[in-house]
Amino acid sequence: MLSIIRRKTRIVDITKQGNGNVPPACHLCSRRLTKEWSFGEGTICSFHRIRCRVQCGRSFWHQPETPIDGLSWDSTTWELTRISSSKDPDISGQKDKRYGRRKEKNPKTDPPALDSRVREHEPIHEHEPIPGRVGPADTKQRCKANLRGDSGFVSIGRSNHPKLSREDCHNTRVPPGTQGVRGGNVQLDKPRERPVSYQHGSKKRSEHRNPVSRSHRRKKAKTRTKTSKLGKSRDIC
């Protein structure tokens, strides 16, 4: 029991005077924190400092008549002064930084006006031909003229090919009513002769090819070598 009383008295003494090893406690809640802020004659903990900021709505200033945690202020003792700290800049009378940054990033501004150099083009009618361009109607006329064989319309960028100009290889005009002729010498009535699979190779190879298989040749070569060796051995004996 005595030890508890002594310990409490020691805590009270440390709270009043302070110790070199133990930081002085808050005068409002007796909390000992590693970081405390001096306001006038006493100290205040970080919790009450935050409460002070929240209630008064300002950064580091507090009015003496505003109570904290329901405790009345004594103007002579608890006249809060401005904290002289480089880490905590003075943002008094301002809102939280985060909301200010969001508003700066996404400002509500009117869309920029159109550049004076961008001029509005006059509306062009759909069927009105544009100078310098080939319209769809013009291309259809050219295609029909090419099919008819009219010389009045010449296709752009194409030479007078015999098949395109309905002429044969000898530059003679092919009458349009002839059967089997379409766009020149191409005859569609006669089917094109295709080579059979065994005719793909050259004829010379097939003529001079030896009908004897390779395996048969090897057998013949082996028998020749055996007979020659036997003959030599008989001669020596």
Swiss-Prot record:
The gene is VP5. It comes from the Viruses. Residues 1-148 are cytoplasmic. Its main location: host cell. It is a single-pass membrane protein. Residues 85-97, 116-130 have a biased composition (Basic and acidic residues). This is Protein VP5. It comes from Drosophila x virus (isolate Chung/1996). Residues 214-231 have a biased composition (Basic residues). The chain crosses the membrane at residues 149-165. The lineage of its organism: Viruses, Riboviria, Orthornavirae, Birnaviridae, Entomobirnavirus. Keywords: Host membrane, Membrane, Transmembrane, Transmembrane helix. Disulfide bonds: none annotated. Residues 84-237 are annotated as: Disordered. Residues 166-237 are extracellular. The keyword Transmembrane applies. GO terms for cellular component: host cell membrane; membrane. It is found in: Host membrane.
